[in-house]
Regions:
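Short, charged juxtamembrane terminal tails flanking transmembrane helices
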Residues: 1-4, 169-180
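Transmembrane alpha-helical insertion/packing segments
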Residues: 1-61
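Hydrophobic, lipid-facing residues on alpha-helical transmembrane segments of integral membrane proteins
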Residues: 10-26, 47-48, 75-91, 150-166
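Short helix-capping/hinge motifs at transmembrane helix termini and TM-loop junctions
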Residues: 31-32, 97-101, 167-171
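Membrane-helix interface/capping segments
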Residues: 57-73, 98
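Functional transmembrane-helix hotspots
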Residues: 91-123
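Low-complexity, acidic polar-rich segments
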Residues: 119-134
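Individual transmembrane alpha-helix segments
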Residues: 133-154
Length: 180
């Protein structure tokens, strides 16, 4: 069982991470400001990761003799797939933003910075709610971007547990036919 889980977790985590890394490369190569695509990126991340999380649990369930998976194995699978996928995605972002083309990061951050300054000038009554535009410049520091890895660990545990609960209780059509 341990080998099945390890193989499935690594394979599906790397697939999810590869897709997300390719998505970021497409954003970079097209010259799009990835900050302005944050909502779209969230939807892409969530969709890809959730698909591979559920797929992993289903694959392991089918490979076991009793066609069942316990909650512990399900949470390890789903959380691990999410962690590996998001880790690969963040590694690609850091590679592009701080090694391959740091100027791209600066251009994206400057664009957001100037938009926030402009918004504060146009709507001074909301300036206190918009926050300090200088905080945006902190994204140029690699230390602030490395924190994402710790955040991904927490997210993976929480979302992994929720997915494990849903996927473990999910009735398969073949299971309900056999029971009748």
């Amino acid at each position: 069982m341990k080998e099945i889980i390890q193989k499935t977790l690594l394979k599906n985590g790397l697939y999810a991470g590869g897709i997300l890394a390719a998505y970021f490369l497409v954003l970079y190569l097209t010259g799009v400001n990835f900050f302005t695509f944050s909502f779209v990126s969230f939807i892409v991340e969530a969709t890809v990761v959730l698909i591979f999380m559920f797929m992993s649990i289903s694959q392991v369930r089918k490979m076991t003799e009793e066609k069942k998976i316990n909650f512990g194995h399900a949470i390890i699978l789903s959380g691990g797939v999410m962690l590996i996928g998001l880790f690969c995605y963040q590694a690609m972002k850091l590679l592009v933003l701080f090694v391959i083309d740091p100027a791209y990061n600066e251009v994206c951050i400057d664009e957001i910075y100037f938009k926030s300054i402009q918004a504060i000038k146009e709507y001074p009554q909301y300036a206190d709610k918009m926050g300090n535009p200088e905080d945006i410049k902190k994204l140029l520091l690699i230390e602030n971007n490395l924190m994402q890895f710790a955040i991904f660990l927490g997210k993976s545990i929480i979302v992994g547990a929720l997915v494990a609960l849903v996927a473990k209780k999910k009735d398969k059509p073949e299971d309900s036919l056999i029971a009748q």
